[in-house]
Design a protein with these regions (language model features):
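Active-site helix of classical SDR
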Residues: 116, 151-154
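Substrate-binding pocket helix/loop in short-chain dehydrogenase/reductase
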Residues: 92-93, 100-102
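Residue(s) in the substrate-gating loop at a strand-loop-helix junction
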Residues: 135
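Rossmann-fold cofactor-recognition segment
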Residues: 47-62
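Conserved NAD(P)H cofactor-binding loop of Rossmann-fold oxidoreductase domains
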Residues: 84-89
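C-terminal beta-strand-loop-alpha-helix "lid" module of Rossmann-like NAD(P)-dependent dehydrogenases
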Residues: 171-220
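Conserved glycine-rich cofactor-binding loop
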Residues: 12-13
Length: 281
């Protein structure tokens, strides 16, 4: 494998953890970032000297930029970066606090710019690459997930600009677009939505309760019908890291392939009708 020294952003759980494991099994030297000290201790205990952990809070991208520059300067070389960290807040658009949108953009978009700026000098030296974890939610605007959807749509354009600006200097940039992923974070998300639904007052429940109920119904069904495991998505990330000439985008998961294929043949009106039927059922 050409990518011998890899930075994995968000290596504590889900796809990021699976990517770290695959890279270690291939003999790569991995540096990863996590949010909590306990997560770092757990990873370093599991992998020993094969994985080095750093605490980075992506909700403050200015501080994250400084930290990522420090991380890169401590490495003798950097062959690849895999960005797997994100948050996925849920809720009706009308009720979602503006602070939720700001935090989602900071973590899911602005921090990606910080990572790009911090790592590009080293990646130019090795002809390396960056792999970002997007979502089919960057192509399909899912009801009840406006903050997440907005950031993933933004990431699509951001990745295109990164790829076009990096390519002339020998750095490749790819985006992986998974559908549903069976992770602890997603299951906790369902718990949180049930809690938020139960906490609605009578007025908000009358106005918006169907959105919570529809989301729970759609998400629970989706997790059982074609959703991927974190390991399966990680394999696609690894494909993007290893390919001699990587694709600009990789669709990960049978559900993602089906959804993107279907949506591509539908009008906006048809898509609106489809989502309204799913949520009003």
């Amino acid at each position: 494998m050409a990518t011998k020294k890899v930075l994995v952003v968000g290596g504590a759980g889900g796809v990021g953890s699976a990517v770290v494991n695959l890279l270690v099994n291939r003999g790569c030297k991995v540096v990863t970032t996590v949010l909590e000290p306990e997560e770092a201790a757990s990873i370093e205990e599991r992998y020993g000297g094969m994985v080095q952990c750093h605490i980075v809070d992506l909700s403050n991208s200015d501080a994250a930029l400084i930290k990522f520059k420090e991380i890169v300067s401590s490495m003798d070389q950097l062959n690849a970066v895999a960005v797997c960290a994100a948050i996925a807040p849920c809720g009706p658009l009308e009720l979602t606090p503006l602070s939720t949108y700001r935090k989602a953009y900071e973590i899911n978009c602005v921090s990606e710019v910080a990572i790009y700026q911090a790592t590009m000098p080293a990646l130019r030296q090795t002809g390396g690459r960056i792999v970002l974890l997007g979502s089919v939610g960057g192509r399909i605007a899912y009801t009840f997930m406006s903050a997440y959807i907005a950031t993933k749509f933004a990431l699509e354009g951001l990745c295109d600009v990164m790829r076009r600006e990096a390519a002339p200097r020998g750095v490749k940039v790819s985006l992986v677009q998974p559908g549903g992923i069976r992770t602890n974070m997603v299951h906790q998300q369902l718990v949180d939505v049930r809690r938020d639904l139960a906490a609605l007052d009578e007025k908000d429940r009358d106005l918006h309760g169907y959105l919570y109920e529809g989301y729970l119904r759609v998400a629970e069904r989706g997790l059982g019908e074609g959703a991927s495991t974190a390991d399966q998505v990680a394999e696609v990330v690894l494909e993007a890291l290893e390919a001699e000439e990587p694709e600009s985008r990789y669709v990960a998961g049978e559900d993602a392939k089906h959804m993107l294929g279907s949506i591509g043949t539908m009008s906006d009106r048809d898509i609106d009708r489809l989502f309204n039927e799913m949520f009003l059922r």
